[in-house]
């Protein structure tokens, strides 16, 4: 029996971010899983009426299944703190830092983790960015600092495409981040309650693990455990735990890496509300350990608390 059995659980999903469709799938899957464990669950699509809706439902605890802005960035977490409703996942500060790639990269460097060389530019400068601003040149990776699910991310191989890619990234929230391109093995680590569960390797059909590759079944191959030497796997899982701890995260996170051929685990980001759909990586890793999806969701729910 879970900690919140018999209590009113609201699964918060949807919202207004560019990742709304993914959140709808995550929320529906988690709600079904929690119901299978005997919980009283109501799905709540997040909009401006959220405070009134939570009061009307007399919610005891919130399972946060949002992705992107206004959900993964500390906004909803702050509201829940003010309303005194315990919730899953990380608190306000950890969520905000994890969502902003410029801020999180600075923290990772301070923690002594391996960070790919990068430059960050305000959106107003996007149209002016050229190779003179980049000591590492091309190829490079351009991404918006405040989006997830690879939204707005492009690999630039031709200097003539750099300005267009930067302008595209500037359409989204936050700085424009340009990283040196590092060829290696893409590895994601699931961390639950501060402990790394395992590392999964991502092998997309195309060069880049983009939005379509993440959420379209059959477009990507996954290998669990990751096909990297044991020593490299140990390094990447230790780095994931350090990043989770360093940002002050709670509950479950997914930490993304590029592992270079020499074993250097270059950290890309910490996802404080990772996807929980049929194609998502945290459930795949948990399943590899024998932890079924309903039990995983209940473990996450059991960790719900006020963090402020």
Swiss-Prot record:
One of the record's GO cellular component terms: cytoplasm
Q: Give the EC number.
A: 6.3.2.4
Q: Which UniProt keywords apply?
A: ATP-binding, Cell shape, Cell wall biogenesis/degradation, Cytoplasm, Ligase, Magnesium, Manganese, Metal-binding, Nucleotide-binding, Peptidoglycan synthesis
Which residues of this UniProt protein bind Mg(2+) 1?
256, 269
- Reaction catalyzed: 2 D-alanine + ATP = D-alanyl-D-alanine + ADP + phosphate + H(+)
The answer to keyword Ligase applying to this record is yes
Pathway per its UniProt entry is: Cell wall biogenesis; peptidoglycan biosynthesis
- Residues at which Mg(2+) 2 binds: 269, 271
Superkingdom classification of source? Bacteria
Q: Which cofactor does it need?
A: Mg(2+); Mn(2+)
Q: What is its main location?
A: cytoplasm
Q: Which GO terms describe its molecular function?
A: ATP binding; D-alanine-D-alanine ligase activity; metal ion binding
CC cofactor note: Binds 2 magnesium or manganese ions per subunit.
Report the residue ranges that make up the ATP-grasp domain in this protein: 105-302
Q: Which GO biological-process labels does this protein carry?
A: cell wall organization; peptidoglycan biosynthetic process; regulation of cell shape
Quote the record's binding site residues for ATP: 133-188
Q: What is its subcellular localisation?
A: Cytoplasm
The family database entries (NCBIfam families) matched by this protein are listed as:
D_ala_D_alaTIGR, PRK01372.1
**What task does this protein carry out?**
Cell wall formation.
Q: Which PANTHER family match?
A: D-ALANINE--D-ALANINE LIGASE, D-ALANINE--D-ALANINE LIGASE B
Its name, as the record gives it, is: D-alanine--D-alanine ligase
Q: Per the UniProt entry, what species is this protein from, by scientific name?
A: Anaeromyxobacter sp. (strain Fw109-5)
Protein encoded by which gene: ddl
């Amino acid at each position: 029996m879970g900690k919140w059995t018999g209590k009113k659980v609201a699964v918060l999903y949807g919202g207004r971010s560019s990742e709304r469709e993914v959140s709808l799938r995550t929320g529906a899957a988690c709600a079904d899983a929690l119901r299978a464990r005997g919980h009283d669950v109501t799905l709540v699509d997040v909009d401006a009426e959220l405070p009134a809706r939570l009061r009307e439902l007399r919610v005891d605890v919130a399972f946060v299944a949002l992705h992107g802005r206004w959900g993964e960035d500390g906004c909803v977490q702050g509201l829940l703190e003010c309303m005194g409703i315990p919730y899953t996942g990380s608190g306000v500060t950890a969520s905000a830092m994890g969502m902003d790639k410029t801020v999180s990269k600075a923290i990772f460097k301070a923690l002594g983790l391996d960070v790919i060389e990068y430059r960050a530019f305000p959106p107003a400068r996007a149209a002016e960015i050229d190779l003179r601003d980049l000591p590492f040149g091309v190829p490079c990776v351009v991404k918006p600092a405040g989006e997830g699910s690879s939204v707005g991310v492009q690999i630039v191989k031709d200097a003539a495409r750099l300005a267009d890619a930067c302008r595209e990234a500037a359409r989204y929230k936050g700085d424009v981040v340009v990283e040196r391109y590092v060829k290696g093995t893409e590895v994601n680590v699931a961390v639950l309650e501060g402990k790394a569960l395992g590392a999964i390797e991502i092998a997309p059909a195309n060069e880049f693990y983009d939005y379509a590759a993440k959420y379209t079944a059959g477009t990507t191959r996954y290998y669990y455990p990751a096909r990297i030497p044991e020593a490299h796997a140990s390094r990447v899982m230790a780095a994931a735990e350090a990043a989770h701890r360093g940002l002050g995260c709670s509950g479950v996170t997914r930490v993304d890496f590029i592992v270079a051929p020499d074993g250097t685990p270059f950290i890309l980001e910490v996802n404080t509300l990772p996807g929980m759909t049929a194609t998502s990586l945290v459930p795949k890793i948990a399943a590899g350990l024998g932890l079924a999806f309903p039990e995983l969701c209940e473990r996450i729910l059991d960790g719900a608390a006020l963090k402020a």
